[in-house]
Amino acid sequence: MLLSKINSLAHLRAAPCNDLHATKLAPGKEKEPLESQYQVGPLLGSGGFGSVYSGIRVADNLPVAIKHVEKDRISDWGELPNGTRVPMEVVLLKKVSSDFSGVIRLLDWFERPDSFVLILERPEPVQDLFDFITERGALQEDLARGFFWQVLEAVRHCHNCGVLHRDIKDENILIDLSRGEIKLIDFGSGALLKDTVYTDFDGTRVYSPPEWIRYHRYHGRSAAVWSLGILLYDMVCGDIPFEHDEEIIKGQVFFRQTVSSECQHLIKWCLSLRPSDRPSFEEIRNHPWMQGDLLPQAASEIHLHSLSPGSSK
C-alpha cells in the first residue's frame, strides 16, 4: 500500500553529502564507449535542457535515464577537483548524490565533441507529480503531507550539500509508485548555495518569488521556501496559485478547494511577500500541519487504488 509506505518514510533525514574528492569519474575519453555500457531506449522527454532517453545498463540490466545536453546550450559551467570542465549540473549532482534516496543519483557521465551525456538512475514504475495531480486532481492532505515531507527533506539535503536547486516544481518531482518515495530531479537550473544575493534565475517563473519578479534579486533559502509554498498549494488545490507576474507580486492566496486551516496557514507563511517573514526549513518541519496523521490504510487504499497495477495491494 503506497500511502503506508510513504508514512514509513517520515523518519528519513538528509544524508551526508558526497565528497567530490572521494569519487572522481574519469574523463569521458578514458572510459569504455557509452554504447558498449548502455542500451539506449525510447525518448522520455525533451526541451531547452536537451533530450532524455530511457536506457538499460548492460552489465546488470539496471534501468537508467540517459540525458543529452548540447554544449552550446550550457550557460553555467563548473570544474571537478581533477580540473575537468563540466556543466554545473554535473558538479551539483555529484555533490548531492549519496545514499539519500530523495534526490536523483548521477551514475556516470560522458563528454562528446558537441554534447555531454549524463547517466541517471531511473526508478520504475514512476510518474512525475505534475501528471499525478493532473490525473487525480487535488490530493487529500494526508497524501500531500507525505509527499511534501519528502520534498522538504530532499531540498534540505541539497542545501546541506551546498546546492540550490532553483527549479522546485511538480514536473521535477518523480514518484516511485512501487516504494512511495519521491525523487527531486533536473538540476540544470541549479547553482552552488551561497549566503549572498542571486541576480540570475533560470527556473520556472510561476514558481519564482516576488522579489525576483520585482527586483531581479533573491536569496536562495527564502526563494526555495516560496517555491515549496507554491508546490504545497498545487498539491492540495490541484493547480498553482499564481499565473501572472502581478499575481505573484500581490501574493494574495485564494483557495479553490476545501483546505484545513493549518494547511492554509503553512502555505500562506511560505508565501509571505517579505522573504524574512518566511519560515525556515526547521519551522516548516515543526509546523502543526506537518505533525498530522495519515489516513487509515482502508481509506487510503480507496484513494490510491488507481496508482499503478498492484501498487495498492
From Swiss-Prot:
Keywords noted in UniProt: Apoptosis, ATP-binding, Cell cycle, Cell membrane, Cytoplasm, Kinase, Magnesium, Membrane, Metal-binding, Nucleotide-binding, Nucleus, Phosphoprotein, Proto-oncogene, Serine/threonine-protein kinase, Transferase, Ubl conjugation
InterPro entries reported in the protein's UniProt record: Kinase-like_dom_sf, PIM1/2/3, PIM_Ser/Thr_kinase, Prot_kinase_dom, Protein_kinase_ATP_BS, Ser/Thr_kinase_AS
Transmembrane segments: none
Organism expressing this protein natively: Mus musculus
Pfam families for the chain: Pkinase
Reactions catalysed according to its record: L-seryl-[protein] + ATP = O-phospho-L-seryl-[protein] + ADP + H(+); L-threonyl-[protein] + ATP = O-phospho-L-threonyl-[protein] + ADP + H(+)
Needed cofactors: Mg(2+)
Name the UniProt record assigns to this protein: Serine/threonine-protein kinase pim-1
GO annotation terms (biological process): apoptotic process; cellular detoxification; cellular response to type II interferon; negative regulation of apoptotic process; negative regulation of innate immune response; positive regulation of brown fat cell differentiation; positive regulation of cardiac muscle cell proliferation; positive regulation of cardioblast proliferation
Function: Proto-oncogene with serine/threonine kinase activity involved in cell survival and cell proliferation and thus providing a selective advantage in tumorigenesis. Exerts its oncogenic activity through: the regulation of MYC transcriptional activity, the regulation of cell cycle progression and by phosphorylation and inhibition of proapoptotic proteins (BAD, MAP3K5, FOXO3). Phosphorylation of MYC leads to an increase of MYC protein stability and thereby an increase of transcriptional activity.
One example GO MF annotation: ATP binding
Modified residues (Phosphoserine): 8, 98, 261
Domain Protein kinase: 38-290
Disease: Frequently activated by provirus insertion in murine leukemia virus-induced T-cell lymphomas.
